[in-house]
UniProtKB/Swiss-Prot annotation:
Residues found modified as N6-(pyridoxal phosphate)lysine: K256
Keyword 4Fe-4S recorded: no
Subunit relationships: Homotetramer.
EC assignment: 4.1.99.1
Cofactor: pyridoxal 5'-phosphate
Catalytic activity: L-tryptophan + H2O = indole + pyruvate + NH4(+)
Provenance organism: Rhodobacter capsulatus
Top enzyme category: lyase
Protein name, as recorded: Tryptophanase
Pathway, per record: Amino-acid degradation; L-tryptophan degradation via pyruvate pathway; indole and pyruvate from L-tryptophan: step 1/1
């Protein structure tokens, strides 16, 4: 059959409150035109993030009921640990309440003033934790990854020549090398297995640990299977194990590719580093066999790790994004191509070319999409990444709007509604105005800053 259906049945539903455009315009204004400030029950289709917003399966809910809440040595932890190590062969699995907590622990060890940490592209919380430690995060994605229209199959790849030159120039300041799979800030683009191995080889040649931000490891493995030469006949678990076999550690938000509503982990091979990390964990998160999570959460994540590598699910998920990208591209909306793993990315800078980057075209598009259709999205551009360490403002490499799809939550009719919203937007986009920021915090401003229309 040509039609790819949702490979699940719906057992429980949550009603969506329908709102009018005047109501949404009032709500956006009251939130300072920051969509993070909206109440979720004022949103029709919530594509702000795919993190922790998906639907758990009946087997995950069953696993919740066997959760053991012992403070230390819970069997829930050991089931969780075994599920992680089945896919990621690390010696030490350190649970955290979500991915940014794992990052905070990692950079409390490896960060510090004067240090520099390369990656393909650091996402917002990673960069925030790096900078909070006093270090600097540098992005070394390939040139194709900065071109929304380029059809390179692995636009998340790290530029190996730039990485080698970087390690030569900054050897003393670099405590580790990272890579993010998939590359969220670059359009949800995948990293090839060959590139992961080559980055690991370079890091180890220069005596640096190699750490993977693995939030969307299963989606990345699907792209490896379907796009990389020699991988088509291999299973998703086999590909996942190969990706992590060359790494010295990983950070993980289990709110993405573990079907969790909460949770994460830091994984390490080095005994001394793991001991130091557990010390930070006990001080900030909890005992090492729960790490800020309830036992029921650990059991739900263990089951989620079994389900996330199912090929029928991955085929459906990736095809959903491809469908929307194809429809938008056909109507002339500039989108990041090829379609990413967890989201559809709109090139707001290209579509709203009359709005300069320092007037936040991505924010203008995101607000308009909410006001017109009730769809909440997220700006990934100058509002998120434009402020420099010295307080100055610089345009980001791209101004994107991300439509991040919660897992197993929306259906085909929701996808068609989103396409229809862009059809309506196309008729009025040239009248949209830019924004200025009137209030912002020092770190990760996009979460809580307030805007005014120009």
């Amino acid at each position: 059959m040509k039609t790819i259906i949702e490979p699940f049945r719906i057992k429980s539903v949550e009603p969506i409150r329908l709102t009018s455009r005047p109501e949404r315009e009032r709500l956006a204004r009251a939130a300072g035109y920051n969509l993070f400030g909206l109440h979720s029950d004022d949103v029709l289709i919530d594509l702000l993030t795919d993190s922790g917003t998906g639907a758990m399966s009946s087997l995950q809910w069953a696993a919740v009921m066997q959760g053991d809440e012992s403070y230390a040595g819970s069997p829930s932890f050991f089931r969780f640990e075994a599920a992680v190590q089945n896919l990621m062969p690390f010696k030490h699995i350190i649970p955290t309440h979500q991915g940014r907590a794992a990052e905070a622990i990692l950079f409390s060890i490896f960060g510090g003033k004067g240090r520099r940490i390369p990656s393909n592209t650091h996402f917002d919380t990673t960069r925030g934790n790096i900078e909070a430690s006093g270090a600097t995060g540098d992005d070394l994605v390939i040139a194709e990854g900065k071109d929304p229209q380029n059809l390179h199959p692995f636009k998340g790849n790290m530029d190996l020549a730039r990485l080698e030159a970087y390690l030569e120039a900054h050897h003393a300041e670099v405590p580790l090398v990272m890579i993010t799979i998939t590359n969220n800030a670059g359009g949800g683009q995948p990293v090839s297995l060959a590139n992961i191995r080559a980055v690991a080889d370079l890091a180890h040649r220069y005596g640096k640990p190699f750490v993977i931000d693995g939030c969307r490891f299963a989606e990345n493995a699907w792209f490896i299977k379907t796009r990389e030469e020699g991988q088509a006949d291999r299973s998703i678990p086999e590909i996942v194990r190969d990706c992590f076999a060359v790494a010295d550690g990983m950070t993980m938000s289990a709110k993405k590719d573990a079907f969790g509503n909460i949770g994460g982990w830091l994984a390490l091979n080095d005994d001394d580093l793991a001991e130091e990390a557990r010390g930070h964990l006990i001080r900030t998160e909890g005992f090492p066999t729960y790490g800020g999570l309830a036992g029921r959460d650990l059991d739900a994540l263990a089951q989620g790790l079994v389900e996330i590598v199912d090929e029928d699910y991955l085929r459906y998920r990736i095809r959903t994004h491809q469908y929307i990208v194809e429809r938008l591209d056909a109507m002339g909306v500039p989108v990041v191509k090829p379609a990413g793993g967890h989201a559809v990315f709109i090139d707001a800078r290209a579509w709203l070319s009359h709005i300069p980057p320092l007037e936040y075209p991505g924010q203008a598009l995101a607000v308009a999409l909410y006001e017109i259709a009730g769809v909440r999205s997220c700006e990934i551009g100058t509002a998120m990444f434009g402020r420099q360490p010295d307080g100055s403002e610089k345009p980001a490499a791209m101004d994107l709007v991300r439509l991040a799809f919660p897992r197993r939550t929306y259906t085909q009719s929701h996808a068609d509604y989103i396409v229809e919203a862009f059809e309506e937007l196309a008729a009025t986009k040239d009248a949209l105005r830019g924004y200025r920021i009137v209030k912002e915090p020092k770190l990760m401003r996009h979460f809580t800053c307030r805007f005014e229309k120009l």
